[in-house]
A protein has these predicted regions:
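N-terminal, polar/charged subdomain of small-to-medium soluble alpha/beta proteins
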Residues: 1-67, 73-75, 81-85, 89-135
Length: 135
């Protein structure tokens, strides 16, 4: 299973509807890599996976650019699909990235979205040994 996220040309839910000219993604080296490794390790513990991959770009990006790739390989398709969902859901809420969107009205730092928090929260009660042990 793979997922490639692209830079959108319009802001997400709650945005002004302005066209996005680009965005700058910032991260904290060391801290971000550690968070991504922790997310990867958690996925490996939850599902029977052969391999996982997380690649996240940073710096200046334009609409349509690829910004993130998550991948999971497993002998069981459901495990791979669930792991991909988990990887992107947790990455969006637990990895320290900061997004500055550039629109016609200037730059605006993007706040975390409630929908991203809700997507990540479902994995806290996923009914598998790893999530139950974390509770």
């Amino acid at each position: 299973c793979t997922f490639v996220g692209l830079v959108r040309d319009m802001g997400g839910p709650g945005a002004t509807g302005e066209e996005i000219r680009g965005m700058t993604l910032e991260h904290y080296p060391g801290m971000t890599e550690k968070a991504l490794q922790t997310i990867d390790t958690e996925a490996q513990a939850r599902w029977p996976l052969e391999a996982t991959l997380i690649i996240h770009r940073y710096g200046r990006l334009e609409p349509g650019d690829q910004v993130v790739l998550v991948a999971a390989a497993s002998g069981h398709r459901e495990a791979a699909f669930e792991a991909c969902h988990f990887l992107i859901d947790w990455l969006k809420t637990k990895a320290p990235f900061w997004k500055l969107e550039d629109s016609s009205s200037g730059g605006q730092w993007v706040d975390a979205r409630d929908s991203d928090d809700a997507a990540a929260a479902r994995w806290m009660h996923a009914g598998n040994k790893s999530s139950e042990a974390a509770e």
